[in-house]
């Protein structure tokens, strides 16, 4: 019948209308230009080379903007005061590798001075032509963004459309909240809200492994199901009703009001959500798939909202 033959297109139509009219759509008025990676290294492809596996995609992402220098923000990496009184930050230990990687693209790095005054740090970000936010601990990163007063500055740079790259924790902070991070809360934060650049949650380094040999820790899927069970409000920008589990070697490219999956993993990502009975449902997302239409198409099917 006509209805059967056109079922997918009908669902896609309603999904696109739902995106357009709800408050969780990517805003077309904002010239977002984000590349959100799950991880920085892939030992199976480019051993020990920071961002090495992603260089072809990074080049395509940055080249149209004629970027000469990129600001590197290492808030997510822990710092300790060593015996001689100096402060040693883990982020500084990878800078040579970061510099070598971007040098291959003809781009210099400029490290954000995390010891400078808040005003000077804000000024560095305001003047950046591109930004790279490294991975580490999401709670450390979130705490620093607010304490340094740079959260609103970064939001403005996102609206300007400058290229912004995030890895792991640096990707999670573009979600509405940090509730789907894998990290321990090694510092206290006053809320879970972050940049809200994208209207859905990411789980970086996604890899569901069932418990074996007496190991009783909760699985990744069980934890993400708990998140979904406690954040089920449809249409809320602070409580997305699905999670994208990004496997290693995968990334999300956000351009304006479009979000697309990219990367080098044969099983790049999983869409995790609850059906109307509260059961966890997973669907594999393919490379080059337009995420928003696909995710809400699947969501509407499972919830029978059409």
Where do the PLM segments sit?
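Flexible gly/pro-rich beta->alpha loop and the following alpha-helix that scaffold active-site loops
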Residues: 107-163
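Structural motif
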Residues: 36, 130-134, 165-166, 201-202
């Amino acid at each position: 019948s006509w209805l059967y033959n056109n079922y997918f297109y009908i669902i896609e139509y309603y999904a696109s209308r739902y995106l357009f009219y709800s408050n969780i759509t990517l805003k077309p008025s904002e010239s977002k230009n984000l590349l959100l990676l799950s991880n920085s290294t892939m030992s199976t492809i480019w051993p020990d080379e920071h961002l090495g596996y992603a260089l072809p995609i990074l080049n395509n992402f940055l080249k149209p903007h004629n970027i000469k220098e990129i600001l590197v923000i290492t808030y997510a990496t822990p710092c300790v005061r060593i015996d001689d009184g100096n402060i040693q930050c883990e982020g500084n230990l990878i800078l040579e590798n970061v510099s070598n990687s971007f040098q291959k693209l003809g781009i210099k790095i400029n490290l954000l001075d995390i010891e400078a005054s808040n005003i000077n740090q804000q000024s560095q970000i305001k003047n950046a032509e591109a930004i790279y936010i490294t991975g580490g601990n999401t709670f450390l990163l979130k705490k620093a963004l607010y304490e340094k007063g740079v959260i609103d500055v970064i939001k403005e740079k996102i609206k300007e459309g400058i290229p912004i790259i995030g890895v792991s924790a640096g990707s999670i902070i573009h979600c509405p909240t940090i509730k789907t991070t894998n990290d321990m809360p090694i510092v206290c934060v006053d809320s879970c809200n972050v940049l809200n650049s994208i209207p859905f949650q990411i789980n970086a380094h996604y890899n569901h492994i069932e418990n074996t040999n007496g190991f009783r820790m909760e699985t990744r899927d069980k934890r993400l199901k708990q998140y979904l069970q406690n954040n089920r409000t449809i249409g809320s920008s602070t409580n997305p009703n699905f999670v994208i589990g990004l496997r290693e070697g995968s990334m999300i490219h956000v351009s304006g009001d479009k979000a697309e999956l990219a990367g080098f993993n044969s099983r790049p990502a999983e869409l995790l959500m609850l059906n109307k009975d509260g059961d966890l449902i997973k669907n594999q997302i393919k490379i080059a798939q337009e995420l928003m239409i696909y995710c809400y198409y699947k969501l509407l099917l499972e919830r029978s909202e059409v």
